[in-house]
Amino acid sequence: PKEYYGFINELATWIHSADPGHPVAIGNGDILFLDLIAKHAPAIDIFGANAYRGWHGFGRSFFEEVQRWLAKPVLITEFGCPAYQAGRPRETAETGQAMYHLGSWVDLADNMAGRGVGNVLGGIVFEWSDEWWKAGQPPRFSPTVQETHPNWAGPFPGGWNFEEWYGLVSQGNGALSPFLRQLRTSYQLYQELWKRF
């Protein structure tokens, strides 16, 4: 990893020389290797991370650790939750997805400038629409069928990740895919949150 972060630092330095008017961010997996980033990539301006930590959000310690090691602003470059839970009704799964997103939204808002740790720039929801090709390769898995095979255990409602079910909108039953978009409960949640924020 130190070679990787050293290379990131070289890139950030070059970008700054070519375009000093824009910040340079890194996309990291959660808060792994903060010590190495601090030592080998000081030229980055923004710490970005893909983080999937559960319905409660990211946890204050996430933002505190970034502040302690890097003293840089944080952008959550990817967060989300599947809208499928094995053996549970669709409505239950969608509500679980929405509550997960709500926890993430609240945690981000509570740690923006002037609040909490104060180092959050924002977050990027993963993702707009379900992707039916992510469960695995043909012939075992089909891109024309939304798979319900769990990919790995994780901090999600029901305890499992279902990679093809992250969308704020679904593709329905697939008869009109890839063009049909059906709004999920989490889409409606964000619609309301943006009105109030």
How would you name each of these model-derived features?
Residues 1-110:
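Extracellular glycoside hydrolase catalytic/binding regions
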Residues 10, 27, 48, 80, ...:
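Glycine-centered small-residue hotspots that permit tight backbone geometry or close packing
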Residues 89-141:
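Active-site/pore-lining binding-face segments in mid-to-C-terminal subdomains
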Residues 126-197:
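Aromatic-rich peripheral "rim/lid" segments of glycoside hydrolase catalytic domains that contact
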